Amino acid sequence: KWVLDTFLDMVAGGLVDLNGDGQYDDNDQWGLFVQPTLGQNLFYATGNSFIAKDNGTLKIAMGEERHLDIMSDISDKVLRFKPYINISNDYQAMIPLFADGHSLFYSEVSLFIERFRQYEFDVGILPMPKYDLNQDDYCQFADGGCISLAGIPIDSKYPDDTAILLDALSAE
C-alpha cells in the first residue's frame, strides 16, 4: 500500500554508500532528494488543510487536535528518516544527480518534469503517499513558491488599482 510508512521505509532502503567511504554525499545514492518543505508537503498529502469552512466562514484549522497529532507524527518521522534524505533547494544540482541514479525518489513540483527531458533515463511519477490506510484519496500539494495567490477583499475601495498593481508585480 502506498502510504507514508511504506514510502519512508523505501527511502531508508534507498541509501547506498556507492563509493564505500562511509560518508554520504553527491557520490552516493540517497533515498530521497527533496526541498526543505518535505514536512509541509507530507501534511498536504494527508488531505487536511490549514483552513476550514465553518457555516460559510473560513477559520484556521491548524490548532485542531487531529491536525496537531498528524503534524507531530510527520515531524517525528521526517527527523527519524532525515539521515536517508538529501534536503536541498539546489534543483539545478539535484536533477542531474537524480537522472544519474543518485536517489531512489525525488519529490518536486510538476513544473520540473520538463527539465528531465534532457536526460535519458526511465522515471515514474507517483502521487505523494497517503498518510495511512484510513485515507480515501491521494492528495497533492501546490507549492507556494511556484504558485502564488493573491486576493482582493470584496469590500476593497480600490479593486481596479489593486488589480493593476498585482498585474504589474506578476509581469516578467
Where are these regions (language model features)?
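Periplasmic solute-binding protein
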Residues: 1, 33-55, 144-153
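Short helices/loops that flank or line small-molecule/ion binding pockets
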Residues: 8-13, 91-106
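Acidic, glycine-anchored loop motifs typical of Ca2+
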Residues: 17-28, 136-137
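Beta->alpha turn/N-cap motifs
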Residues: 35-38, 108-113
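Extracytoplasmic/periplasmic substrate-recognition and gating elements
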Residues: 116-172
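Pocket-flanking alpha-helical
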Residues: 9-19, 113-116
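Glycine-centered hinge/linker elements that transmit conformational signals in sensory
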Residues: 4-13, 41-45, 49-89
